Amino acid sequence: MAHSTGSENPKTKRKVCGQCENKAALLVCLECGEDYCSGCFAKMHQKGALKFHRTTLLQPKSQILSNILIAAHQFIKEENPPNEGNHPAEASSKSQQKPKALLQNSSEVGATASEGGEGENPRCKVMWEMPFDEEASAQSFREALTQWRAGHQEENKEEEVHAKKPVFIFLDSVEECEVQTNLKMWTEPINIEFTEDSLSYMETLWLKKYRRTPQEQLRTMLPNTFTHPHQATAEAQCTQNENESDSDVEEIKIKSPPLFMPVEKLNIERPPPSLTIVELDDTHGAEFEDPGIAVPYRVELADSESQLSSTFTDYQTCFPCENEIHHHLIFNKGKADLLSLCLRTNSRYHKDDIKDFGNTVESCTYSDEFKKIGETTSFEKNETEKNIDPQNNKDSVDSCMSLGSKGSLPTIDSSTSFIEENSSQDTNTSLKCSNQNERSNLGNSKTAKEPLFQKVTIRKKLIKERYQGPKKFYSVDKNERLDVFPSSSIKGSHSCSEITSTVSEDKMWIPLSSLSGYAGSADALCDQQSDENPLPNMQQQKSGQKSQRPSTANIPISNPDQKDTSCLLFSYTRSKSAAAQMPSRAASEISEIEYIDVTDQSELFGGNTADRQALDTLEKELNILRKPADPSEDPHSLPSEELQAFNDNFLTLSQMSKDLLEMSRESDPHGAESSSSGRNPEIQPLLSLGDYSTDEEEDEFLDKQHVIKLPWEKRA
């Protein structure tokens, strides 16, 4: 027995390699948990993830604190002192938890017992010779764990007494020992204090070098902060009696003032604002002493009818040099007041028209912007109302017949004339008018049948507008309206009115005549009629508004049996062939120039024969190009019955044009010269239209008139 144990001792002192089991283990793999010799470790850790395994040297005699192991053995002895059978079981359970460590201890104990020669004590037996009860060891471990967690004071004190004397035992490996410690809790808080000596010597040098302001300047700025440090250095020099180097070190340790000076708040003085808002009451006129500095105005809150009132004082003294500009600005501010003034003025001229029509036609339509007041004319509004209302279809025929016996003059919107009159007046007069009529206009707007916005958005009848062509998209200026809508009457016997705008059922627009001819002849005839046969303003406007229709023609009919048919047929044919040319600003200027030089037109045309021949050749080429190959291809050809009525109608027109020519010769010698030469732009189309029977020939004739009236012909 002793020999066998003596032979096993040298083998158990050093571990054997786990792979070859022949060589002693030198390395321990931390990932694998196995002991290797150098050769076996190199063979096993060459591929894959094994290359990254870490190793440590095997320490056969490592010293560990074994106070917890001793406490565990003492606990087992105190638990089961009489029961000898349970003690080895509990010891074996502890050896299961710490197998190799306890095996070493038990082997040493067994070796000493065998050397003594007496194995009477069962505790001295080798642990592997004792029976092992797994359930009992598990139960004892649970009980020990619960008692340890409960924290018995007495047992802890005894363990602490034994723990004060640590016992070192030799183990083969660190990994084989599983230690459980009971650390003390730190009751004292950690205090970190920064003193004068906390800065190192290099840090103090850095502070001296990179200081923002020199230290002498800081002493002058903050003298109180340096009194105490100087006294402290003086006491240190007296007590310690050190040399100069030590005194320099003490000066370095003086508390320095803060590196960053406190930032002072900048008080920026702002000047008082030049603009002041003062809320004025009813007595603001007496309190306001200096009217030349500001222009006060009072704005009242808008009620349900969106009323805005503004009052202005001392306008001329404030703005002596900019009356026109501020006149516009003031009326921009009082837009509602000026709008009501315009409406009141327009309503005087439109009262009779509203009664005659018998429907609710408003005097003036409100516009969203102020600039649209001048652009909207009474003729256009009445024209659109007639187009919208289907009940006025009969009135159009009556208007054609009425103009056979009554003359009509071109009408200008009263709102346009009102604005022109206001522009010619002084600033004082305009301001007085706006201030005087302010209250009355607001009262008139209250008594209106419909509110401001309902007139714009809500209509009593459905809107079914006819196609208006490019007329809808181009703005017509007030100077150009005179050229677009001319009408004339001579001596009250006959009248000839040009067709203003016509549209066919297939919505094809064809030009009627040139703008220059329109302007020259219409203005000359209008002036002649106004001199010979003047009419009242109300009668002119009534007849003009009743007769002006975009799809009808104002033609006098001699035969009373053919009044309705001839008028409608003429409007139908002209709707397919003739349309008013939309004027532009350049065209209006040309018409004005031709109107001024209408007396010299015949002389210029008669003197230049070469230009006349060139124009004739152009007419021939134009006729060839305009003539279609097949008459069936003409999209505007009329049936035979309509053509016959059309021819009869134009025979009547030719007879009427001859009478007009004779009367113009008697009244105006210049007009006679131009008509004798055959180039009167107003009468020549009427003379020659009777010779044509188709729309195609009529278009050719109109193109010929365009060529004759070219603008560069006057320059020649």
From Swiss-Prot:
Residues 92-109, 420-446, 527-560 have a biased composition (Polar residues). It comes from Mus musculus (Mouse). Keywords: Metal-binding, Zinc, Zinc-finger. The lineage of its organism: Eukaryota, Metazoa, Chordata, Craniata, Vertebrata. One of its GO terms (molecular function) is zinc ion binding. Zn(2+) binds at residues 17, 20, 40, 45. The keyword NAD does not apply. Residues 659-671 have a biased composition (Basic and acidic residues). CDD domains: Bbox1_ZBBX. Disulfide bonds: none annotated. This is Zinc finger B-box domain-containing protein 1.
